Amino acid sequence: MADVEVRKEKKKKKIKEEPLDGDDIGTLQKQGNFQIKPSSKIAELDTSQWPLLLKNFDKLNIRSNHYTPLAHGSSPLNRDIKEYMKTGFINLDKPSNPSSHEVVAWIKKILKVEKTGHSGTLDPKVTGCLIVCIDRATRLVKSQQSAGKEYVAIFKLHGAVESVAKVRQGLEKLRGALFQRPPLISAVKRQLRVRTVYDSKLLDYDETRNMGVFWVSCEAGSYIRTMCVHLGLVLGVGGQMLELRRVRSGIQSERDGMVTMHDVLDAMWLYENHKDESMLRRVIKPLEGLLVNHKRIIMKDSSVNAVCYGAKITLPGVLRYEDGIEIDQEIVICTTKGEAICLAIALMTTATMASCDHGVVAKIKRVIMERDTYPRKWGLGPKASAKKALIAAGKLDKFGRPNENTPKEWLTGYVDYNAKKPAAQEVSPTNGSSEPSKRKLSTSSVEETAAAAVSEETPSKDKKKKKKKHKGDEEAPEAAEEEAEPVEKEKKKKKKKDKDRDRDEAQE
């Protein structure tokens, strides 16, 4: 009996509560309202478990904590399901045989969306990580296509090699910048190009069959098939690639919630027939998941829509900024709710931002957020409000320009910076006198202005005649050459006349 009890105790396993994985965003969305709240002092929060772009936000440098939170927009995980689909991506396990474009077209048809794009073409026989961007997320496709890739390849050598060490040594030689030419069967022009291989490892090698498996981390656009051929040449026996799988594209790997085509189909079927969003939210991830490795700048809610319309990203609109921002570095501008507004190129370093109180922080590279997601908050100052009142009263035209009803106070007190300044500006007086100094015209300049006035009054025919005279003067040296040409032209005309006569006679 005692033995039986011991066995039962061994069989009973304690069910451990597994901590929620940060990548499982389907379950994270219901845990809380992820949003930065305005405060007068630094709040003590544990933001290490916050998702996406708000992770560790309390470690960002604070420029200001004072702003007016707006109810518009929402956390990427709490978006409405239709909006969630339009601003998401799928980390897809591409099946063998169909091309990347076919797979993307199928997903577009399954999800019933307007646009889809992918992170870089995979050959039909190649499987693995293919990031499919949906609708608004297609704006990130270019940055994903240029991101680094990782592959696992199976190769076969055409002859025996002395040892596995030789194969490993050959792989190590194929690192750094390499010359590559696309394979015989390829969709692009077969011209020589340089691609960088960052790292490679020989995972396994079978000496009996001369087959091996290696892992490689390389630049986008590298040809692994060509690399296998080069490995065979380095070893002196020749070689070829048998199979290939992409295990990482950018920051998304095959371990980061990769899904199959069947998962996408099942998720959409559940949503359409049972209104169950849970699986669809697990299959599709918010586009902010692709920008986690970018340096962040958090903007005030009132300046979000202005940036969406292309306004400059200036310091007064910045709430927080990350350490280590360098000039010309690609960064992400985000809201207090963790939504990506745009990708930008930094024009200030972190140190400059800390020491300045004005200036342009970054220039926009690609706007991601839809316009008017947040309300317009520009044109609400005292001058702008007064201008709107005058337009409504008819004292300014609909474009805000002065008309006959415009009051004198407005004309003297308002400076329109959008109006184009005249080319000849008045020179500021250098003397102590209040009157602006006027430059006296010389007698020659007076005569020139008078002559110009007379020439303006004369009809345009005289101008044409003058132009013809000038042309005649220019063409004078070429006259000798032109005299020889008429003789040849006359001969040609005679020949044409003779041909015309022959045709007429033939018709008669």
From Swiss-Prot:
Domain of life: Eukaryota
Keyword DNA-binding part of the UniProt annotation: no
Pfam family name, one: DKCLD
EC number: 5.4.99.-
UniProt GO MF annotations: pseudouridine synthase activity; RNA binding
GO CC annotations on file: box H/ACA snoRNP complex; nucleolus
Major subcellular location class: nucleus
Domain PUA: 294-369
Protein's cellular compartments: Nucleus, Nucleolus
Biased composition (Low complexity): 442-457
Family indicated by similarity: Belongs to the pseudouridine synthase TruB family.
Miscellaneous comment as given in the Swiss-Prot or TrEMBL entry: The name minifly was chosen to reflect the strong reduction in body size of heterozygous mutant flies.
Subunit structure, as described in the record: Component of the box H/ACA small nucleolar ribonucleoprotein (H/ACA snoRNP) complex consisting of Nop60B, Gar1, NPH2 and Nop10, and associated with H/ACA-type snoRNAs.
Stored PANTHER family: CENTROMERE/MICROTUBULE BINDING PROTEIN CBF5, H_ACA RIBONUCLEOPROTEIN COMPLEX SUBUNIT DKC1
Name of this chain's protein: H/ACA ribonucleoprotein complex subunit 4
